[in-house]
Amino acid sequence: MALDFLAGCAGGVAGVIVGHPFDIVKVRLQVQSTEKPQYRGTLHCFQSIIKQESVLGLYKGLGSPLMGLTFINALVFGVQGNTLRALGQDSPLNQFLAGAAAGAIQCVICCPMELAKTRLQLQAVGPARTYKGSLDCLVQIYRHEGLRGINRGMVSTLLRETPSFGVYFLTYDVMTRAMGCEPGDRLLVPKLLLAGGTSGITSWLSTYPMDVVKSRLQADGLQGTPRYRGIVDCMRQSYQAEGWQVFTRGLASTLLRAFPVNAATFATVTVVLTYTRGEEAQVDSEAALGTSPTPAGSALAQPSSL
């Protein structure tokens, strides 16, 4: 169990490192003004960040997701597995419900973590920097705004994470069963990578508009007076000013990120288990990832993609 958890965390770290540049592009595209847009699109945003801030600019705010990774994976694994066992039957509906429960519980850590990440990604470079790092960011927010400030965007995070994790685990379960992911299959790892990457894409598509709202609420007031009074007001103002397209802003970079992040996660989990458990790695990697050898087998699971 301990090695399964370690492998999941290692896979999550790999996923964060691969996906963080795409995430920072997504956030900047989501929150930029339409009146004076700084970036023309995903590629231009990448180029501008590297030109103005170097490659390191693509890893602003990396500490925050890495900091919360262990706890988030522990919650996701524990809650999803225990909920599925409590429900008693490994059915598609229960996969969705167990995943949704895991998504909801991990918001306690995910929300403050993403708040710090968003603030760090959007702050100026050089002497004008407000925060020295993820921890300093959260400390300053707490001093000025209290616990309410730390939990800014919690409701929108819950509305995003709860259904998206349900869709995530459901898609992964359906795909691994459909492809026949059996222990000993020489194509097992590619199949798991395909299932994980596709699951990441479908989960993002299911709740992406709420992610835009969440990013705007967490960035609100960073450069002046707050604009939004809440989720509904943010949606209304955003729609009136920019049309429905605003709720798909940054989607391209997010989907580009989703597949390789999950591919990196699954590959790392497999490698870690291979080197730590030798001949048992193939079976253990199935257990850690929750792959069921038969339709009535154990629950499917994977580390959080962040």
Swiss-Prot record:
Q: Which GO terms describe its molecular function?
A: basic amino acid transmembrane transporter activity; high-affinity L-arginine transmembrane transporter activity; high-affinity lysine transmembrane transporter activity; O-acyl-L-carnitine transmembrane transporter activity
Predominant location of this chain?
Answer: mitochondrion
Query: Keywords on this record?
Result: Amino-acid transport, Membrane, Mitochondrion, Mitochondrion inner membrane, Repeat, Transmembrane, Transmembrane helix, Transport
Say which domain of life the source belongs to. Answer: Eukaryota
Region (Disordered) residue spans: 284-306
Q: Which PROSITE patterns match?
A: SOLCAR
Its membrane topology: Multi-pass membrane protein
Q: Which SUPFAM superfamilies match?
A: Mitochondrial carrier (SSF103506)
Q: Where in the cell is it found?
A: Mitochondrion inner membrane
Which spans are transmembrane here?
2-22, 61-81, 96-116, 153-172, 187-207, 255-275
Q: Where are the Solcar repeats?
A: 2-86, 90-178, 190-275
Fetch the InterPro entries from UniProt.
Mit_carrier, Mitochondrial_Carrier, Mitochondrial_sb/sol_carrier, Mt_carrier_dom_sf
Q: Which family does it belong to?
A: Belongs to the mitochondrial carrier (TC 2.A.29) family.
Q: What does this protein do?
A: Mitochondrial transporter of arginine, lysine, homoarginine, methylarginine. Transports with a much lesser extent, ornithine and histidine. Does not transport carnitine nor acylcarnitines. Functions by both counter-exchange and uniport mechanisms. Plays a physiological role in the import of basic amino acids into mitochondria for mitochondrial protein synthesis and amino acid degradation.
* Protein name, entry field: Mitochondrial basic amino acids transporter
- Which organism is this entry from? Mus musculus (Mouse)
Q: Which gene codes for it?
A: Slc25a29
